[in-house]
């Protein structure tokens, strides 16, 4: 699933290519992604200009003139490509194709159809039902040790579950949660309310560092993810624990272990993490 760094990479690619472009047409090739597609709403973006693009957690928000916003989630396997319209040949799972000025097309391909495209018309996209409960952004000053400690002391659930809770902090997905916990030497199975303030400070620092490094590498490609140019992310080459079950830890040579926490595969080093 595309996580925060991957969505941030897509956002930056879109900013470079589609800002100030006019939307000439939108072709919808499916009736349903995660939610049924409201074609009457989507056609409202036709003949409008793209003004701004933001990210909120794992969502893209595309601001369009006349106070319209597209809220897009890539789901498990969604890819957005910006290509030359004259060279476009439709392939399987191209569910939405937006034709833009300057011979550009924005193509949304999603084999598993867990993503969604929603149109917001009330001028306040952050109050939309899919965004309103989001917690703080991890790369902002609002995400700090005092904030995290205040949340951790309220729950005994495993620390990995807590830092992946979008109501607390958005966008720290499965890959980066495992990597940040390794970087801060904290076992993913620790009860949240046992984490000390010093450990919380280290964890906040690790989350920020890991996410920022992943963004500079264009995200992580395990299977499906590609950026707007169709290129993979290269952070896979820097993963210390994720996906490395039974391989030697780069730090201590102990074998990496895995277990399932809240239905998500979790990777850790029993020696380095306490």
From Swiss-Prot:
CC cofactor: Zn(2+)
Superkingdom of source: Bacteria
Binding site for DNA: 93, 112
The entry's keywords: DNA damage, DNA repair, DNA-binding, Glycosidase, Hydrolase, Lyase, Metal-binding, Multifunctional enzyme, Zinc, Zinc-finger
Gene3D superfamilies in alphabetical order: 1.10.8.50, MutM-like, N-terminal (3.20.190.10)
Family matches, as SUPFAM superfamilies: Glucocorticoid receptor-like (DNA-binding domain), N-terminal domain of MutM-like DNA repair proteins, S13-like H2TH domain
PANTHER family membership: FORMAMIDOPYRIMIDINE-DNA GLYCOSYLASE
Protein name per its UniProtKB record: Formamidopyrimidine-DNA glycosylase
Species, as recorded: Francisella tularensis subsp. tularensis (strain SCHU S4 / Schu 4)
Lineage per the UniProt record: Bacteria, Pseudomonadati, Pseudomonadota, Gammaproteobacteria, Thiotrichales
Gene: mutM
């Amino acid at each position: 699933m595309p996580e925060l760094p991957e969505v941030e990479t897509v956002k930056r690619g879109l900013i470079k290519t589609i800002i100030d472009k006019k939307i000439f047409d939108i072709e919808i090739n499916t009736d349903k992604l995660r939610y049924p597609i409201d074609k009457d709403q989507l056609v409202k973006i036709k003949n409008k200009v793209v003004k701004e693009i933001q990210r909120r957690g794992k969502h893209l928000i595309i601001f369009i003139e006349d106070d319209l916003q597209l809220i897009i989630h890539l789901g498990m396997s969604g890819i957005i490509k910006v290509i030359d319209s004259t060279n476009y040949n439709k392939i399987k799972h191209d569910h939405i194709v937006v034709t833009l000025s300057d011979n550009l097309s924005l193509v949304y391909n999603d084999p598993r159809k867990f993503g969604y495209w929603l149109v917001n018309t009330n001028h306040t996209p952050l109050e939309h039902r899919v965004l309103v409960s989001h917690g703080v952004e991890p790369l902002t000053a609002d995400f700090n040790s005092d904030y995290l400690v205040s949340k951790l002391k309220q729950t005994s659930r495993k620390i990995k579950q807590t830092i992946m809770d979008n109501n607390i902090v958005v966008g720290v997905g499965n890959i980066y949660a495992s990597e940040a916990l390794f970087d801060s030497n904290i076992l993913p199975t620790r009860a949240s309310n046992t984490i000390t303030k010093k450990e919380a400070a280290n964890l906040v620092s690790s989350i920020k560092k890991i996410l920022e490094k992943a963004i500079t590498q264009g995200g992580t490609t395990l299977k499906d993810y590609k950026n707007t140019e169709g290129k993979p992310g290269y952070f896979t080459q820097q993963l210390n624990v994720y996906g490395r079950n039974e391989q030697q830890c780069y730090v201590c040579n102990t074998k990496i272990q895995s277990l399932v926490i809240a239905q998500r595969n979790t990777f850790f080093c029993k020696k380095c993490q306490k």
